[in-house]
Structure formats: C-alpha cells, structure tokens
Amino acid sequence: MEFKQGDWVRIERNGTVYEGKVMPSMEGYITIKMKSGYNAGFSIDKVRITLLENNGETANGSRNGGKGCKTNEEELPEPGKKLPKIAILSTGGTIASKIDYRTGAVTSQFTADDILAAIPELKEIADFKGRVISSILSENMDSDSWQNLSKAVVEEIEAGADGVIVTHGTDTMMYSAAALSFMIKTPVPIVFVGSQRSADRPSSDNAMNAICAARVAISDIAEVVVVMHGTTSDDFCEIHRGTKVRKLHTSRRDAFKSVNSLPVGTVDYGTGEIKTFIDYTRRGEKALKFKPGMEPKCALVKFTPGADPTVLDYYISNGYKGLVVEGTGLGHISTKWIPLLRKATDAKMPVIVTSQCLNGRICDRVYDTGRDMLKAGAIEGEDTLPETALVKLMWVLGQTDDFEKAAGMLREDLSGEITECTQR
C-alpha cells in the first residue's frame, strides 16, 4: 500500500500491533513515532501495514480521527491581541533539533516557528515573533556569532519587544549569555533557553524549559538570564544570571547551576509563579545601551602540575591580546610560570587569574606564590567563572586597547560577574 510522511498507520508483525505516525524513512523501510514518544522501524516486506489516517485525515474523510496526529503543515495559532510581545530568536542546538533519519544522529533543523508550533501552550503566554539567527550546534559559536546575535536582540527590543527569548545549544550557552550580558544593558528580559534532550525523546525537557522561559520573558527581571530545569523532575526551572551560570553535567536535565551566587529565582512549571532570591535589575530600570565589539585573540589556559610554562610563549609570540589562567586553589601556578606571566604583562597583555575550583574566591595574597603573581601583573578574577572571565576579557579589549584602562575595567564588576560576598 502507499503511505507518506504524516500518515497514521497500524503495523502488524509476528502477532504484535504497532500504531504511529509515519516519519522520514529509508527506502524499503517504514519508521513510525508511537504515542509513547518512541520511534520504531520495520522492513516493509516483513509487516502488514494498514492506513488509519491520511496525513491527519481518516479513511472516512474526518480530520484527526481522534488520534491527535498533527502534521508539520499545521498552522500556528492566531496570536492574541492583548498579550505581551515576545521575540523568539533561534540559533540552533538541541532545543531546535530532531533526528536526522539519514544518519540517525540529532541535527539542528527546527526553526523558531517550528518550536512555537510544537509547543502550543506558548500562545497563552505571549504573542511571539519567530526569527532564525542561525541553525548551528553551539560548539560552532564564536565571537562573531555573539555579536550578530546581540545585534538581532537589540533590533527586537528597539522594535518594541517586551522580552526576548534566545534558543541555544546548551554546551556553550553560558559563553553566549555572558557575552550578551556585557554587550547589552537591557530594559527588558533577555532569556536564554535550551534543552538537554531533543524533542524526539520522551524525556525531552524542551517544552517545559521553553514555557518557563516565556514566563520569565514577560516578568520584570530585566537582565540576561539562563532558564533551565531546576531538578531532574518536571517541577520548576531555575533562573540564572548570565555571568554566574555554568553547565555542570553532560546530560542531566538540571545540568545548569549558578556558581558563587544564588539563582536569580525559580519558575514553577505548574503555576507559572516566579520566586526571586537575589537583587536584580527590574524592567525599565535601565535604558537600552548596546556596546558591541569583541577581541577574538584571547585564550583560556588551564595550569596543570608539571605543565611547560613556554605554552604562554605561544600566545605572546602569536599576537594574542589577553589571557585567562585557570590556577589551582586560591589561584596559583608554578613558580616556573611566573617569569612568562611577567613577559605577557610587560607586552601589555592583560592576564586574569581564576580558579579551577569554580566555587570560591581568588586570593593571591595568602601564599608567596600568589604575591609573586600579583607583582608580575596578574589580575585577580575574584569569584568570576573562568569562561565568564574569558568573555569579559574579549569584550573589554574590544572596547579599548589601552592596557591600564583595560586592567581597571577587568577589576570592576561590570555585569554581575563579581559578587561583593561569595554566597556559595
């Protein structure tokens, strides 16, 4: 029999019956998505196939046939007229991914409109305008990507958006969130959201995360934040400041945590209630300011015992403009590294020191090594995360090439990256 993608079919094989929607399939095979959310594939010549719905239309001509089977051509809901206006900008990543049936791998193919169609609950929260900025996995983001994204966000705010949601791959989302935190001072919420598991998987977190992100986008939290699962259950999402968040697990749904700070707050998935735990910038409190410009020739170097200090020479001799060094404990490196650190700062290359511990604060005044590092010109990163310190360095050097001015800016708290008192 003939069938096509989107048809609802019954498949009988060895006395077992399967029902589902036809998905893209290889020649000679049929793949269906069952109600459970799982996919199943069969060799066509080894099964009996019965058509139940013709692309959402039953055999007697009625629509949907009670199965709730929706096709990719389903129209988006008409936006309400009195709801807040939210721009949703898609950059790719797992939240905008699905299975590539050619390879069996996950690929970034969904657009912002696809996300809106797949999560109809969003239409009850706001009027959404979808826009694709890129369709890449987040490991392919770079400083140019951050600037293009920030420009698009500013354009949406200037056009009257009450909030902006950025869908993003989780692996480097903290870098992008930090970058926009430094480039944009915003009067409205800018919310990064992603998912750890693609929409094809029954355990996908994309719908809950997107709904919670929408709640934050219409709130009065006018900062760049990351909204992701707070636990492994579907109970609430956490709201993390863009400069204080880190992905701390490869695959758990609650992989993102605030470091050296409490989260800004939480969003209850069931009620939509937002609770806040720390001070934050409120909607309309600041005027929109946009300062793009990133220096890409900066590097993050991790110190390890016995590491050859001449690794720093590579960056000095190849025209790099700044370095972040991840030291041990309170921010230490081998004494053998200190002459190279001095060589870098003598070359007017700012060097920020952070800690591999992540939690806690840098203090290079306790031990002799730390004091020698300060004498060599090292800048203490305080309780800034290494990744945030790198992005901050890139942004500062994109604003000025004056060494002393840059060093002064790097010692300041510019976007919540340094806390006066480390809370965690």
Swiss-Prot record:
Highest taxon, organism lineage: Archaea
Claim: Protein biosynthesis is one of the keywords in the record: yes
Catalytic site: 94, 170, 171, 247
PROSITE patterns the record matches: ASN_GLN_ASE_1, ASN_GLN_ASE_2, ASN_GLN_ASE_3
Quaternary structure annotation from Swiss-Prot or TrEMBL: Heterodimer of GatD and GatE.
HAMAP family noted in UniProt: GatD
Protein name from the UniProt record: Glutamyl-tRNA(Gln) amidotransferase subunit D
